[in-house]
Design a protein with these regions (language model features):
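Short, small-residue-biased leader/transition segments that mark boundaries at the very start
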Residues: 2-9
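Acidic/glycine-enriched edge-of-secondary-structure segments
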Residues: 10-13, 73-85, 140-161, 218
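Short connector loops at secondary-structure junctions
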Residues: 41-49, 133-155, 212-220
Length: 266
């Protein structure tokens, strides 16, 4: 559905590391290689329904599933996936309305799906709510953001686009702040930190990032969030209203076919 909603994006790739996780599991866990276990890990593309059905048919054919059964199950699965995404968006809009009605603030805790795992996020969402903020995920508000383009980075990764769109929503909503959860092991995420910071600071919003790999307990994270809360309170006390001070977009210079004949990029 992202392609339909954001046709201006050049492409929409998903993490190449995640696609290889099943093979990593199979090659490193003896339990899944035991003779009485069939470990299936077909490569599937959720953005291409016909391809998805073909791959599932190939993977499940030996188990007695018919094409009709797989087609019906696939249609129901895709419908439920859209319901799930819409539920998240609806909840995000519900929380934003609640913030206005109760004069409260929220933090968009922008992280990858695996950051939802309490073993990975170390309880950061609960800690933030204990300090008086509501917590929103980036995919609960990204659909409300209208990111201006071109931006400095190549916008081709599915999660990165959600991140930039959610930042675009934060800069236009005075009740929202953003904290980015970043894992050192994800090299692709390294480019997002500077870009998100540029988007936020273009409208005088405070950028905060928490490096998950460096957080062994909540002490450091709590200090960072308390500092953010204090900065927000100081701004409120001084009647400071963030506004646009710069553009986060660029005028991208395109390297044309004609220029290839006369120029060399070093």
């Amino acid at each position: 559905d992202r392609r339909q909603r954001q046709m201006c994006i050049r492409d929409s790739f998903n993490c190449p590391m995640v696609t290889s996780y099943p093979e990593v599991i199979y090659n490193n866990m003896d339990v899944v290689r035991q003779s009485d276990i069939n470990f299936l890990y077909p490569f599937i593309n959720l953005a291409d329904k016909p391809s998805f059905k073909r791959q599932m048919m190939k993977a499940l054919h030996d188990y007695g599933f018919t094409k009709t059964e797989i087609d019906n199950a696939s249609e129901k699965a895709f419908a439920e996936l859209q319901h799930y995404k819409q539920d998240i968006r609806n909840k995000g809009e519900e929380v934003l309305k609640w913030l206005d009605e109760h004069d409260e603030r929220a933090i968009v805790l922008a992280g990858r799906p695996y950051h939802i795992d309490p073993e990975i996020n170390h309880g950061i969402p609960d800690m933030i709510t204990s300090l008086g903020f509501a917590v929103l995920t980036e995919d609960s508000v990204a659909h409300l953001g209208h990111l201006e383009r071109d931006i400095r980075v190549v916008d081709q990764w599915a999660y990165h686009t959600r991140l930039y769109e959610s930042a675009a929503q934060v800069i236009k909503n005075p009740r929202l702040e953003l904290i980015q959860l970043n894992s050192f092991g994800c090299g692709l995420d390294a480019v997002t930190t500077d870009q998100v910071q540029e988007i936020l600071q273009s409208h005088e919003k405070i950028y905060t990032t928490l490096k998950i790999d460096e957080v062994s307990n909540l002490g450091t994270a709590r200090i960072r969030v308390r500092s953010l809360k204090a900065a927000v309170k100081e701004r409120d006390d001084n009647d400071f209203i963030p506004h646009k001070i710069d553009d986060y977009t660029i005028n991208r210079v395109k390297f044309t076919e004609e220029e290839r004949k006369k120029h060399t990029i070093i």
